[in-house]
Amino acid sequence: MVYKFDPVDFNGTTFHLDRASGMVKGSTQFTGQNLPIPASYFPKSLTFDAASAKLPDMFHMSRGYFIFSERARAVIEDWAPGQVEFIPVACHAQPRIAATLNFDSAYYFVNVLGRAQRLRWREIPSNKYPTQRDGLELLGLTHDFHKWKLRERAPGEPLIWHDTPWQDGNKKYLGQDNVLVEDVLWQELDANFPDQLHPLRAGED
């Protein structure tokens, strides 16, 4: 059983970041090639200028860019050592806002290092992108994660990963934008941090 990793909270729900808290332009050149984003592309600090609740342990800075607390880092390091890079980020807020957020001892941007090719592309719907000049057809995942199908995890494969692009003749299938999590790790995160993850179970209606 596999889940699409998706924290419930992001900038604009329980908190709001200032305008300077953004990724350096150019980071998409790495995600497009299914490569980890170099640490130098991440902001060194985040400034919170509003808050309505305690800061969660896992959240989006913006869609697709995740931040973990020290507590969440410890769970990942225990269950999936070496599969995630944690890039420290300093968090700042005025005293009143900081009191609401109740900061943990440290926060980190998350670079998911795990890679595996587990999507069963021939059995699932896909979106077609413009054909390349060399005739290569590019296809990607639909947003309907209920229809995604994945093979079983092989021994030694990561518990949290980006799926590796797969080529079949002149067709190349791309699903690396999503972070996928094996059930055992997702359940551990959910147990430690209840109601912080959307239960987006792949392949089940």
Short names for language-model regions:
Residues 1-205:
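Phosphate/anion-contacting hairpin/loop surfaces
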